[in-house]
Design a protein with these regions (language model features):
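Beta-strand-dominated extracellular/periplasmic modules and repeats
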Residues: 2-243
Length: 243
């Protein structure tokens, strides 16, 4: 006989695997580079040690420096492009807030160009935009940052291949091994449907990687607003890149 849950207890979710949340496979032939970097053997489970379960909990800011929540005010001038506000929550499988989560942000500029030396596309570099930021979730699991909408860029996977506009997010938890990486796309971008990286995540899970336009987050006469919640695990989890 199954024991009834205590009043107010959270529901039991049962067995869960990465594929339940649409996590992309390590091998996806349309994404060409996965054909030569995907493991040839099944992954081996490893027991966690002190290295994996410990880390600078509550001390990330002391190690990494102060948060950089406004990417439009890092240099003396103003970056080119459409200013946007991105806000959301980091949640667990029961949609409870996860405070003190570090979120690293990196992206291309409005022309689709990254600032790093290995980006050799001839789109212009914006001297007033680094494309990198970092925020920390508050006690309600909420985060917010200001940036410019990134541009699309070619990436050489196949003829006329273009990556849709996206923002990379890396989430760091209480331990060194608790790093999850995902991307946020934009709801009006036609390139999502033909992008192999995005399409490695099947529908309907792919939709969890698309930010929602939110007029309530828009700053009048200044910036558009998008909402993007991140669920860390469970059947409603945001798809993350493979570990």
């Amino acid at each position: 006989m199954t024991k009834s849950p205590e009043p107010g207890a959270l529901p039991t979710l049962g067995a869960f695997a990465d594929e339940d949340a649409g996590s992309p496979p390590s091998l996806f032939p349309d994404y060409r580079s996965t054909t030569f970097r995907s493991p040839l053997q099944a992954p081996l489970p490893m027991a966690q040690t002190l290295t994996e379960v410990s880390g600078p909990a509550g001390c990330w800011e002391r190690l990494m420096g102060a948060a950089v929540a406004d990417l439009t005010r890092q240099r003396a001038g103003t970056p080119l492009g459409q200013r946007i506000v991105v806000q959301g929550h980091v949640l667990d499988e029961h949609r409870r807030p996860v405070p003190h989560t570090i979120i690293e942000i990196w992206q291309a500029n409005a022309a689709g160009r990254y600032i790093h030396a290995l980006d050799d596309w001839d789109a212009p570099i914006d001297p007033n935009f680094t494309g990198a930021g970092r925020v920390v979730t508050d006690e309600e699991g909420r985060y917010r940052y200001v940036t410019v909408r990134p541009g699309a860029y070619p990436w050489g996977n196949h003829r006329n291949a273009w990556r849709p506009a996206h923002i990379h997010l890396s989430l760091l938890g209480p331990a060194f091994a608790t790093r999850l990486v995902t991307q946020m796309y934009f709801p009006d971008d036609p390139l999502i449907e033909i992008d192999p990286i995005a399409n490695a995540v099947p529908m309907p899970y792919r939709q969890r990687m698309v930010g929602r336009f939110d007029i309530g987050l828009c700053e009048p006469n200044w910036a558009l607003g998008y909402r993007f919640d991140v669920v860390l695990k469970g059947t409603q989890a945001t798809p993350f890149q493979g570990e």
